[in-house]
Amino acid sequence: MKDLDWNNLGFSYIKTDYRFIAHWKDGKWDEGKLTTDSTLHIHEGSTALHYGQQCFEGLKAYRCKDGSINLFRPQANAERMQRTADRLLMPRVPTELFVRACKEVVKANQDWLGPYGSGATLYLRPFLIGVGENIGVKTAPEFIFSVFCCPVGAYFKGGLAPSNFITTDYDRAAPMGTGGVKVGGNYAASLLPHELAAEQGTPERKFADAIYLDPKTHTKIEEVGAANFFGITKDNKFITPKSESILPSITKYSLLHIAKERLGMEAIEGDVYIDQLDQFVEAGACGTAAVITPVGGIQHNGKFHVFDSETEVGPVTRRLYDELTGIQFGDIEAPEGWIVKVE
C-alpha cells in the first residue's frame, strides 16, 4: 500500500501506475491493454476536440474489512455509457469489456486503494472519445475507450454535513437534448452557473452549487449541480424528480431501492416543484463523488428555505447514507448483482 495520508485525501487527480486503453477501428474493438502512459496521442482533427463526441463515467472501488475489494454496480455504468454512446453515434463499449477494464485497473493499482476504515476509495474514470482524421461534423472514424483511477478521500472531512444551494436562471439541458446522458458538454455548460452560485454566497451562508430547474417552465427541480435531488416528506416518502433531461444517477436509483426495500418508505419519481419545498423535512443531492450531500437550504427568488437544519444531518438522510456506504464497503449485505469482486 502506498504511503499516503489516507485519512486526509481530497477529491483531486493523483497519478497512479496503470490505466486501460482499447481502440475501435474498422468496426470492432481490440482487446485493450494496461499501460503506464497517462498521455493520449490523438489526431488534431479528432471529433472529441471539436464537436464534443465524447462521454465518460464515474465509479468507485472499496476496500472491505477482510481486505477484499468491491466494485459498486459497474454493469450499470456500462449500460449508461452505452446509452450515451447511442445518443452520440459512438460504438458501444461491451459490458464485458467495460467491467474487465475496471477490474484490471483496480487490480493493477490496488496499492493506491486505502485501508478499510479510512474512508478512502479508488475513483475510476472510464471515458470514450472520437479520434482520427476528420474536419466535418460527422461521427469519428476511430474511437478510444480508456479507464484511469485516482485515490480519493471521504468527501466530507469531519463527517457528513449539509450544504446550501441557490437556483439559477441558466438551463443545464434542453428538452430532447443531451441532459439524460453523460457527455462532457453538459459539465462545461455548468461551470459558469457554479461560479455564479458561489459568488452569491456570504461569509455567513455559502452556496455549494446551483440548482437547475426544468428548461421548459422553470418551475420544477431537475439537478443539483452535477447531482440528483431527493426529498424526504413528513409521511415517510422518498421523492426524486423524473425528467428526460435529468442524468439517471446510479446512486439515486440505489437509494430509491434502499428507501423502499430496506427502510420501508414509499419511493416516488415525479415532479418536484420549487415552490412546494415545504412538503420536505429533509433533502439531499446524490452522486458517486459524495454519495449523499445533505441539503441544508435552498435560495430561490431571494427567499431561503431551510429543511431539517443548516448544520445537522437529518435522521433519514443519515440512515440512507449509512446503508448505502455499508453495502459499498461490504459491511451490509448487498442486493443481488450490486457488488463485483476484484479478485
Curated annotation (Swiss-Prot):
- Gene3D superfamilies given in the database record: 3.30.470.10, D-amino Acid Aminotransferase, subunit A, domain 2
- Give the pathway annotation: Amino-acid biosynthesis; L-isoleucine biosynthesis; L-isoleucine from 2-oxobutanoate: step 4/4; Amino-acid biosynthesis; L-leucine biosynthesis; L-leucine from 3-methyl-2-oxobutanoate: step 4/4; Amino-acid biosynthesis; L-valine biosynthesis; L-valine from pyruvate: step 4/4
Query: Residues where N6-(pyridoxal phosphate)lysine occurs?
Result: K182
Pfam families hit by this protein:
Aminotran_4 (PF01063)
Keyword list (alphabetical) reads: Amino-acid biosynthesis, Aminotransferase, Branched-chain amino acid biosynthesis, Pyridoxal phosphate, Transferase
Query: Known EC number(s)?
Result: 2.6.1.42
Q: Does the entry feature the keyword Hydrolase, yes or no?
A: no
**GO BP term, pick one:** L-valine biosynthetic process
Region forming the signal peptide: none
Provide the cofactor list for this protein: pyridoxal 5'-phosphate
- Cite the PANTHER family for this sequence: AMINO ACID AMINOTRANSFERASE, BRANCHED-CHAIN-AMINO-ACID AMINOTRANSFERASE 3, CHLOROPLASTIC-RELATED
Protein name as it appears in the record: Branched-chain-amino-acid aminotransferase
What gene is this protein a product of?
ilvE
